[in-house]
């Protein structure tokens, strides 16, 4: 990338789900060049591609071989199953996945340059988040690409860290406790309140204050 800015990199997205949508939009807003979006769902591929001014495809064999960076954001099982097809003919580009629970070495033996870019946040397509405050954790099989991924992540977020696969696995587990388990408690609370004809909205000030406290006090 000597003599060129990182925004000049051509980026292809494999996946157009919640995380991919938010990450692609964030990169696009910062001036990065998204050249293609792949999703097996035509509507998802088209919607994201139009937003970031990219081409789209629903066929793995039609994924461009010209991108410099491929960002894979698929469900874990689909990623593992499709990995050989995804990288075929594009083994010399830089490949990263965005999963918290999948180790970096899943790429080993498939591609030359690889890593992880893990934004630790809960995402939905309908709700855009402030990437500037999202912790992003990076890892790569080369120091040069670690720095490249840090530079890319730093264009989006003020909070960029290098983390090993083992550390990231623990981060992901902690995130599940913090987010998924909490949301399940909300569901149970909502069901209980509904049973007795009470509104869940009554819980919102309590939820908000509990969340605010953790910013100032130890859990």
Language model features with spans:
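Phosphate- and divalent-cation-binding pockets in alpha/beta enzyme and binding domains
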Residues: 22, 47, 81-82, 106, ...
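NAD(P)+-binding Rossmann beta1-loop-alpha1 motif at the extreme N-terminus of oxidoreductases
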Residues: 2-57
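Rossmann-like NAD(P)(H) cofactor-binding subdomain of soluble oxidoreductases
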Residues: 42, 52-128
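Internal alpha-helical scaffold of NAD(P)-dependent oxidoreductase catalytic cores
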Residues: 9, 44, 48-51, 128-215
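Short phosphate-binding/catalytic loops that engage adenosine nucleotides
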Residues: 32-33, 112, 158, 198
